[in-house]
Amino acid sequence: MLGSPFEPQCGDRLSWPREKAVADANVELVAPLDCHTGENPLWCEERRLLLFVDIPRGVIYGYDPATAKCDVIVRTRVTGGFTLQEDGSLLLFQDGCIAVLAKNGTVSEGARNACPGNERFNDVIADPEGRVFAGTLGGGKGRLLRFDTDGSVTEMMRGIGCANGMGFTPDLSGMYFTDSFARRIYLFDYDRRSGNLSKKRTFAKIPRKIGLPDGMTVDAEGFVWTALWYGGRLQRYTPKGKLEREIFFPAKQTSSITFGGPGLHEMYVTTAANSEPDPLQPPGYDVTMHRGGGLYRTTTEGVTGRPEFRSRVHFAP
């Protein structure tokens, strides 16, 4: 661990031309790292930091837009994702267990054996009531779990190829969920009081030839943004599931997206340098192209984000 953790030392190509799709977007590499699998970008408003993780290396970074510095927050074990707790700590969903990164930099175990040995956590999100929905992956037998604020866990879904990006509709009546291997973003009815999900249906399906849907977020207008692994782009969908625009990146393995910065006007995008062979690569995928590993920032006129919810999950000692 280096220093204090919070004080650092859907469809085919668009019908319009590519130039129009990205005309108002400025893409810049703000942290030229070599993350194996950069993921889980999350804006911390109190500390004005963009937090993200390199999953297999267990390194959590903090990027400060004011100084343009990116520092290591903590080095820990494999971490599939994390949430910001209401008290300012981080809840780390790791390979088999859940840990807490306190504001003073100490890491303590929260829940042991939270995920079986053949699974690991891959993407997580806090809901409006402080629960956490946590997806897992493991040999095509991944699950979606819900951790309530008392630490109890409920299995919401099983048989998932690769659990990934999640988000909520602005009226909090629906929850989006991504299965990357199925190349689909699903929409559920969401009951805020109970945390239950129902009426699963396909919101968007991504053609294999352009990549896999990975991390996602929902903007202030209720439009859905998804990062396409292998696709080197973000896609924005209307609340009706219609592809509205694309923003292209020089890195092919765009992995996740969040809004951050003043007024949540900036989009931060993680990427991955991972070069392992994958049968899910699109036909004709050029393995010589730049995959990624760094953190990118982009803006597009008139688009802003919404603050992410804080978790309030606590585990008995």
Give residue ranges: language-model regions.
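Blade-level signature of beta-propeller repeat domains, shared across WD40, Kelch, NHL, RCC1
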Residues: 260-317
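Flexible "stalk/tail and boundary" regions
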Residues: 65, 86-87, 101-105, 111, ...
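A short loop-to-beta-strand structural motif that recurs across blades of beta-propeller domains
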Residues: 59-61, 97-99, 143-145, 184-186, ...
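A short beta-strand motif characteristic of beta-propeller blades
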Residues: 26-32, 68-74, 108-114, 152-158, ...
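Residue position within the beta-strands of beta-propeller blades
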Residues: 51-53, 92-93, 133-135, 177-178, ...
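Beta-rich, blade/repeat-based domains predominating
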Residues: 32-47, 76-94, 115-132, 141-143, ...
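Short loop/turn segments immediately following beta-strands, especially the blade-tip
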Residues: 188-195, 300-304
